[in-house]
Amino acid sequence: MHHNDKQRLPFAGTSHGETVTCSKDLNSDLFDAVLGGLGQFGVIVRARIALEPAPTRNKWARLIYTDFATFSADQEKLIAPRSDGSFAFSYLEGAAYVNHSLAAGLKNAGGFFSDADVATIVARAAARNATSVYVIEATLNYDNATAASVDEVLDSVLKELRFEEGLAFVHDASYVEFLDRVHGEEMALEKIGLWHVPHPWLNVLVPGSRIADFDRGVFGGILQGTDIAGPLVIYPLNKSKWDDSMSAVTPAEDVFYAVSLLFSSVANDLKKLEAQNQKILRFCDLAGIGYKEYLAHYTVRGDWVRHFGGKWDRFVQLKDKYDPKKLLSPGQDIFN
């Protein structure tokens, strides 16, 4: 969900058996339709994407929080553009660890934290009587031209944040090492038998005004006392970075959060985790949290209408134009 604003030029295969070149200036309605269109209008068979030189190294930081309000405020500060349009960090994500699974979760974070680090974090959480711990993960890219100043720049950013005192962990890594970080986490999970198992993931986009309610009800409620295998990812996004003419739908607020509960099923608990996911969604529904599921799957037309909201009528019109026989992606039960 991290992308730049450089123009993409998809080549989409439609149900008419055509390959259509499209962009913001050419066949723009198809261009917008296929982006987040769940395969309903065409299949992107080729894309032209502008590239730029990659950095060589980065400062890779993980910052520890025991208070959600402080954590989310710092995250939102970091995604706000500065006066010159730049951002404090090159990359930003976040994670939550519920207390019951805190030590195990930190140890499975791709080897980033040492055993001593884990012990220190667990002790601080206990001292704060924290039911959850939150981590901001961020990088600051640099190359030979900026190597002499990168530490000073990083320190100036960290001074603006309110993480737990003394609990900023920084690695100096090659850019390739950072990009390959998930592979390290995969290897760690594979060693303990948690990779080649079912993964009942739940991905939702939560309005910024309701993320504290989500935290209290889910991280501080439903997931408390459970054994969690897999990362709980949470970070804010600027709606201004999303083109609202695309089929993709997001909450109608300037800032919303991507929350990815990336569970791994162990000990034959798949059904339990699926039921837990439904419990989380029911909580959001009852609390009136206007979330949107990412990669949603509904079986009732009314749920799809609710999901697309104000984009539904346009979605139907484009379906009639580009796939009138309803041949593409019938398994999603949107039109079938």
Q: Which positions does each model-derived feature cover?
A:
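Extended, charge-rich low-complexity interaction segments
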Residues: I121-A138, W201, S265-K271, D320-F335
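Activity-critical C-terminal alpha-helical subdomain
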Residues: V182-L194, P200, D285-N336
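A short glycine-rich, hydrophobically flanked beta-strand micro-motif that places a catalytic Asp/Glu
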Residues: S90-Y97, D227-S245, G290-H297
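Extended C-terminal subregions enriched in glycine
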Residues: V206-I211, Y257-A258, F263-L286
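Glycine-rich N-terminal segment of FAD-binding domains in flavoprotein oxidoreductases
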Residues: M1
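Generic non-transmembrane alpha-helical segments
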Residues: D74-R82, S156-E164, D213-T226, K279-I289
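C-terminal substrate-binding/cap subdomain adjacent to the FAD-binding core in PCMH-type
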Residues: R8-V204, G208
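C-terminal structural cap/anchor segments
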Residues: V204, S209-V259
